[in-house]
Amino acid sequence: MSRPADPLRSVERRPLWQAQLPPQPDRRARPLPDVVDLAVIGGGLAGCAAARRGAQLGARVVLLEAESIGWGASSRSGGMCHPGFKWGPAELMERHGAILGESIYRESVDAFEWTAETIREEGIEAAFVRSGHLQLAVAPSHLEHLATAAASLATVGEAARTIRAPELRDEIGTEAYAGALVVERSGGLDPARYVAGLAAAAERAGASLHEGVRALRVRSQADGRAVVETSAGPVVAREVFVATNGYTDGVAPALRRRVMPIGSSIIATDPLSEDLAHAISPNGRMFFDSKNFLYYWRLTPDRRMLFGGRASFWPSSVDRTARILLEGMLRVHPQLAGVRVAYAWTGKVGFTFDRMPHVGRLGGVTYATGCCGSGIAILPYLGHRAADWILGGEPAPALASLRFPLVPAPYEGRPWFLPAVGEWYRLADWRAGRERPQD
């Protein structure tokens, strides 16, 4: 008897979104301007949004991207777009006071709505849908925490509720969870098309975008301006905005000591039949679970299962993480057994010690960083707001009021301590998985 074919037998080791992106303009070998009002370092979502807004304000803007537009996390994510942070509204108000805490949360809501409006305004074909999402409880105790989260969201007017396991059948084709938090203000998009659309919008507004140009160092001049030294020569700028997130290197040493690059991996299957896709996700929701080593998944616009997670805190190959994710996907959705995995890839997520995004000024530059796994809405919005702040004289975002903590360990950009942290999280997830269901 022949063995079943390996689902990973012919996987492409690149992001699905990049593979499906139409050809883009060649932005390499363009001459750099000598002097600008705003130099943006990083050509992802935050950088392109800042460049667009700066140019709209009439500034001379140059964007410097070491690889290609959207090459990093901006085109490697699951494409899930939603308000909120690790901490809900009630926790934010407890930590930062009622006024600031609520303002911070509402910025995340504004970011989601700004995303939808920008896509509409610029005519970006990013397959944006308002689908809502489910956070699935791996244990009964987690469902209790999710009920608290639903109550917290209700205090700021968000439509959220919890459902128990029997009700899950109307939302998802799995019996692996104890229940879920359902949040309606949420959605999905194609992140590669979104960042490409923001880049095109920035160019239409007058920004100059350059690929294959690595920023090496930023130094201050006596006249208050900065010199950005690059692999293609220097640029003098009145303001510098750094938007490198999980790919931050020596160009911004102060940020590098505050942002930890953590790997996240994704697989995507061949397109599913309409019947199988509907059985798995009848309402087209975005999904993620309540573990520390969480899984997140969704159906893509062409009905592929996209399944991701932090498969390991140890250095791992794409093939190894793809195998781990395949096993996880089949535990959640055994009906996908035998479906071929077509794409597998990894990327770096920028995490901060307080698990919050940050925007502000540090070491002579302005920055927006720390997506913490939920950056599609908030980071480009912060890029937009940062340009308004430093060029247009608008108030700083509420998030700029937060102290940006250093990583409390000897750390210069290589998170050597993550494997030990990961094992602690894995043990907590194992214990949660052993809880008995409640009657």
Which stretches of residues belong to each language-model region?
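Helix-loop-beta segment of a Rossmann-like dinucleotide-binding subdomain
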Residues: 27-28, 125-135, 167-201, 205, ...
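Helical element adjacent to the flavin cofactor pocket in flavoenzyme catalytic cores
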Residues: 144, 151-152, 178-238
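Dinucleotide-binding Rossmann-like beta1-alpha1 core, especially the glycine-rich loop
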Residues: 84-166
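C-terminal catalytic lobe of FAD-dependent flavoproteins
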Residues: 313-317, 322-435
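Glycine-rich FAD pyrophosphate-binding loop
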Residues: 56-76
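N-terminal Rossmann-like FAD-binding beta1-loop-alpha1 element of flavoenzymes
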Residues: 38-63
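Active-site substrate-recognition segment that forms the wall
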Residues: 113, 121-129, 215, 223-225, ...
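Extreme N-terminal leader/targeting segments of oxidoreductases
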Residues: 1-38
